Structures are given as C-alpha cells and as structure tokens.
Amino acid sequence: MLNNTGFDLWADGYDKSVGLSDENDRYPFAGYRAMMNALYQRVLAQSGHNVLDIGFGTGILTSRFYEQGCRIYGQDFSARMIELAQAKMPDARLYQGDFSKGLVPELCAQQYDAIVATYSLHHLTDAQKIGFLRALLPLLKQDGCLFIGDVAFRTREELEACRTAAGEDWDSDEIYSAPTSPR
C-alpha cells in the first residue's frame, strides 16, 4: 500500500489516473463513475445532509455533495489530497489521519446522516474492516446510512481472474472483498 507520501505524490494526477482506468474499464477503477453516481443519488435521497467521507482523496464525490449544500466532514491521510479537496470545498471540515488507527476526535464528536467510504476500506484487513465499521455505527443519526463503494468481487474466481488480467498493475497490498465458495 502507498503510504501518505505516496498518495501525496499521486494526488495531482489522481483524478486523471482514475478517469483513464474507468474509461478503459481497467483495474482498479473499472466502473468507478457508475458506482460513484449511484452512491451519490442514494446519499442525496437521505433525509439530512451531514456527510462524513472516509478516505475522500481529492474530493471527487464529496465535492458533489458539497455543491448540493451538504455539510461535509472527512478524514484522509494525504496532506496533498486534503489540500486539493479543501480548495473544492472551502467550508468542509477535513482532517488528516490514518483511519486504520481510528477517526480523529473531532469527527467522533459529530453524528451523520450518511457515512461514505469509497475506494478506501481495501486498505484494512477483514478483521479491521469489521471493527472499523462497528465503530462508525454509533456516529450515524437514527435514520443514517453507511455507504461503501470499493473494489469487490462476487466470487474468489472473479478476483483471481482480475488479478491475472491486471498483471503487474495488481496491488497485492490491498485487501478486496470476495466471498469464499462453499466447500
């Protein structure tokens, strides 16, 4: 996995890199735009508009919520990505921190109508994902929802086929979801 310095270096070309991967239907961002659009519609359908974004990157999705008048909160571990996102959303409350170690205290002091995690949870082991998601649930308002968009596969076979097709582009440090076939 890239460390925060790696993401800082990638930040200025991140949006273009994601777009090219999606346009070419290539790992890891194949289907990115469609997933983000679907998630965007679901979040806006929520009754309130306090949104927490975990690992928001350059703010591709989060800035769309911001433009619709949502109150934006977020945590990312790349200072450069935060800088780029903050320029798109001057009033957003964005914090730097490694969410694998938990949220910064300022974010834990709020409650949210929607918590969004896109292309971020794959940095956690399955056990860490479960613990982190459990820690997020009390931060949701009564009718709040948690939305996850990430690389995932219907079967282990699909995951292995993608790994083979991606070749040297495959990031073996990332932990993607795929159910195990029954034996």
Residue ranges of model-derived segments:
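A conserved beta-strand element that flanks and buttresses the S-adenosyl-L-methionine
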Residues: 116
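Phosphate-coordination loops involved in phosphoryl transfer and adenosine-cofactor binding
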Residues: 48
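A short glycine-rich, Lys/Arg-flanked "PGG" loop and its adjoining helix->strand segment in the class I
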Residues: 130-142
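Short catalytic micro-motifs in class I SAM-dependent methyltransferases
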Residues: 119-120
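Short conserved loop adjoining the S-adenosyl-L-methionine
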Residues: 101-109
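Class I SAM-dependent methyltransferase SAM/SAH-binding core
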Residues: 52, 58-102
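C-terminal alpha-helical "lid/dimerization" subdomain adjacent to the S-adenosyl-L-methionine
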Residues: 148-183
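Conserved class I S-adenosyl-L-methionine
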Residues: 1-45
